[in-house]
Amino acid sequence: MFSCRFISATREYSTLEKQVPAPYLRRSFEIKAPVQRAALTICGLGFYEAYLNGQRITKGLLAPYVSNPDDILYYDRYDLTDRLRPGKNVLALLLGNGMLNCPGGQVWNFENVRYRSA
């Protein structure tokens, strides 16, 4: 089993009036000893690119697979065991809109859809 934290922006971060087209998230962290096992698990409703220490680790161009979130959500898991090193490491994510965050919100009452609060 694994443990994880849910990461999201505040509700005020991106609205119809102030859109952020491709948020870039970056986190530096220190590792004091060699890693025995580590993985990154990502599940999102839009597309992303993941980088570790400046190297792209994303499996494909459109990650994750496109799905209908009312039925199924896919996740990607990346084994980072051999990629992490003692000392400073940097994880970065470039987020894209995907199918569920397309323009046209005023028409579809976009501000109030359930998945926007995730």
Give names to the regions the model predicted.
Residues 1-13:
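Boundary/junction segments of secreted and surface-exposed precursor proteins
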Residues 14-15, 20, 25-118:
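Accessory beta-strand-rich segments of carbohydrate-active enzymes
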